[in-house]
Amino acid sequence: MRRESIPAPLRLSLSGPTAVHDAVVAASTFAERAGLAGASASRLAIVVEELAMNLYDHGGLGADDAFDLELSSSRAEVRLVLIAPGPEFDPRQSISREFSSSRGGGAGLDLVRTWSRLLEHDYVEGRNRVALALPIATASGTAD
């Protein structure tokens, strides 16, 4: 499937009880506007959901704290930038897992690492900034 257009970048600041849901809806809408195939659209939504959920579950983000989500795309990849307050978290470092049978014990971050490439990580003034690239799948389901 050849994508005909590249949508304008999307930048959102999200907070409150619907923030994770709103982030997933925004990612899905962005994927649709970008003309992403099913696999790429699904992966983008899952990566956004996992990262946003981890902010609340493990990153100390409170209900009133806001995080920023930026999405942009090229012909070959979608770039995702997530900026959030909290303790420093460098996704390049190995994570000690406390496995939980009910939650999957780190499976979400494993998906994020499998489906994306870390472009950069910064920690400045109490805020993490993580930039990832997700390759866009072709019609056959493989990344370009």
Language-model segments: residues:
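Conserved short strand/loop->alpha-helix "switch" segment adjacent to the catalytic nucleotide/phosphoryl-transfer site
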Residues: 25-49, 101-102
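Short alpha-helix lining the ATP-binding pocket of the histidine-kinase-like ATPase
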Residues: 49, 53, 57
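Heptad-repeat coiled-coil signal-transmission/dimerization helices
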Residues: 20, 24-27, 112
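Conserved beta-strand-loop-beta-strand hairpin that lines the nucleotide-binding pocket
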Residues: 1-11, 56-144
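STAS-typified acidic loop motif
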Residues: 9-22
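Solvent-exposed, charged/polar functional surfaces in cytosolic regulatory/catalytic domains
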Residues: 26-30, 54, 118
